[in-house]
């Protein structure tokens, strides 16, 4: 790095200078959403908002001591029987804002197929299903999660149990509506669309239209979204009746207790700086965001070869493996989740200490959703964005939209350089292993599966190198280990 330090220093100075110019040129324009109640209302407890005692008890069991801002804003309207459209910053407690009124109504009028929740991703569907089950554990709730990548026959059996709540992705739900004998939603009382902007961005309009045609017009509808796009506005007009509008965020808002930094690095040492950052924060849970599925796998394999407890999560993994990686990270059996933007929205992983943008997000809103995986529910967190000489323009655009300059993350260059040789060796070995995996797939040969990586053997089995001498996470790889009122149908 010494032979290029001069040019790297010049690049850094240009970068810092351009940041200042760019931020003076442009003021962020945030999207203000109309509120029904403009005056500030004193914080109330769940009981004071009208939540019934069984559900207040359930909230307490889950550690929800007081309503979040979106819950404070949405629950009074929802409990009065109104349709609701809510915009809230990530990690704001949206699930509780729609689950509580649904369950309260279900207690008074128990029936099967009471509520349908539509989500854009499988992982979010499972998470919402788990939260419904946790809230309804004391009242005999039955919930079913219906998503792609899972056997249709097994799902048909789950629907035959006549669950109270169905949480589904639009495509698979339409498959069952069209093909599963005896299944219909003619008696549905609630429709909830969570992450509605993302549902529409993923081209589910055709499926949504089919679903809206076969459910009752006389229903209550809640629509929750991170942003108010033209498509969301159109969907609101088509599916909601005189909704109460609540908002606790703007388009590019991040939570106050999130410390945001950038680190400017030469592209050829990008992996080394990532290893340095993870070592600096050893013992903390971290999500590392990558741009592609291939990069995600390669970085995860590289980190495991260096002895770090990393698991991948991306769209090309089977549903079983995706849930396996997610559950290991959520249970703290693994410290590092390396993923694409599949994990950037909606997933509730409360213990994330740090987010690293290894690859630059393509849009400002993607940046907000990524860093929103940490500093959730009142906790503090740190987000560090890796900026190379090729990312400067995209990064300056993000800063301008945020309306603030991020602090530079200070590092000791000599300590980074100590890691170069081993990191480069691990990176090369990861490439070799990835190439072998591709060749095995093409040839159709079977190989022993690893719990974390799907089609790789125990990561780094041939090349694994501990990094205890680096003073960081280290170890031999591997896992940490060790570590009422009832309703009828």
From Swiss-Prot:
CDD domains: DEADc_DDX47, SF2_C_DEAD. Residues 75-246 form the Helicase ATP-binding domain. SMART domains: DEXDc, HELICc. Its EC number is 3.6.4.13. Keywords: ATP-binding, Helicase, Hydrolase, Nucleotide-binding, Nucleus, Ribosome biogenesis, RNA-binding, rRNA processing. GO terms for molecular function: ATP binding; ATP hydrolysis activity; RNA binding; RNA helicase activity. It catalyses: ATP + H2O = ADP + phosphate + H(+). It is an enzyme of class 3 (hydrolase). Residues 433-489 are annotated as: Disordered. Probable ATP-dependent RNA helicase which may be involved in ribosome biogenesis. This is Putative ATP-dependent RNA helicase T26G10.1.
């Amino acid at each position: 790095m010494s032979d290029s330090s001069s040019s790297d220093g010049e690049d850094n100075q240009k970068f810092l200078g351009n940041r200042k110019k760019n931020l003076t040129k442009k003021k962020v324009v945030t999207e203000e959403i109309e509120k029904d109640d403009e005056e500030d209302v004193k914080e109330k407890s769940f009981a004071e908002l009208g939540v019934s005692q069984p559900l207040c008890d359930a909230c307490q069991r889950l550690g929800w001591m007081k309503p979040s801002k979106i819950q404070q804003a949405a629950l009074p309207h929802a409990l009065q029987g109104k349709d609701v459209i809510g915009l809230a910053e990530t990690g704001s407690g949206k699930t509780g804002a729609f689950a509580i009124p649904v369950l309260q109504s279900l207690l008074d009028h128990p029936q099967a197929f009471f509520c349908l929740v539509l989500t854009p991703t499988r992982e979010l569907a499972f998470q919402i299903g788990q939260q419904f089950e946790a809230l309804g554990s004391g009242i005999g709730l039955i919930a079913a999660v219906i998503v792609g990548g899972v056997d249709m026959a097994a799902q048909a059996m789950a629907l035959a149990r006549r669950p109270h709540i169905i949480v589904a992705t639009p495509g698979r739900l339409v498959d069952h509506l069209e093909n599963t004998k005896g299944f219909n939603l003619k008696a549905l009382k609630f429709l909830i669309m969570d992450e509605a902007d993302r549902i529409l961005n993923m081209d589910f309009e055709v499926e949504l239209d089919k679903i809206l045609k076969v459910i009752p017009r006389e229903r209550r509808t809640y629509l929750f979204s991170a942003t108010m796009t033209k498509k969301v506005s159109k969907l609101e007009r088509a599916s909601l009746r005189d909704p109460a509008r609540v908002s606790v965020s703007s388009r590019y808002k991040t939570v106050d207790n999130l410390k945001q930094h950038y680190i400017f690095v030469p592209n050829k040492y990008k992996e080394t700086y990532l290893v340095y950052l993870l070592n600096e924060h050893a013992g903390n849970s971290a999500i590392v965001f990558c741009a592609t599925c291939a990069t995600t796998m390669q970085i995860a394999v590289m980190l495991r070869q260096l002895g770090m407890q990393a698991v991948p999560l991306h769209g090309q993994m089977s549903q079983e493996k995706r849930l396996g990686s997610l559950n290991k990270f959520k249970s703290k059996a693994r410290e590092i989740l390396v993923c694409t933007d599949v994990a950037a929205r909606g997933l509730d992983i409360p213990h994330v200490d740090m987010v690293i943008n290894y690859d630059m997000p393509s849009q400002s809103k993607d940046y907000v959703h990524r860093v929103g995986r940490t500093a959730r529910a009142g906790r503090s967190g740190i987000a560090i964005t890796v900026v190379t000489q090729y990312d400067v323009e995209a990064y300056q655009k993000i800063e301008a939209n945020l309306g603030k300059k991020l602090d530079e993350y200070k590092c000791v260059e000599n300590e980074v350089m100590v890691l170069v040789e081993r990191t480069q060796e691990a990176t090369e070995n990861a490439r070799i292993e990835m190439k072998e995996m591709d060749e095995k797939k093409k040839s159709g040969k079977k190989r022993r599966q690893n719990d974390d990586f799907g089609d790789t053997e125990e990561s780094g089995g041939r090349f694994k190198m501990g990094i205890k001498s680096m003073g960081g996470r280290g170890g031999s790889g591997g896992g940490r280990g060790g570590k009422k009122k009832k309703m009828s149908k």
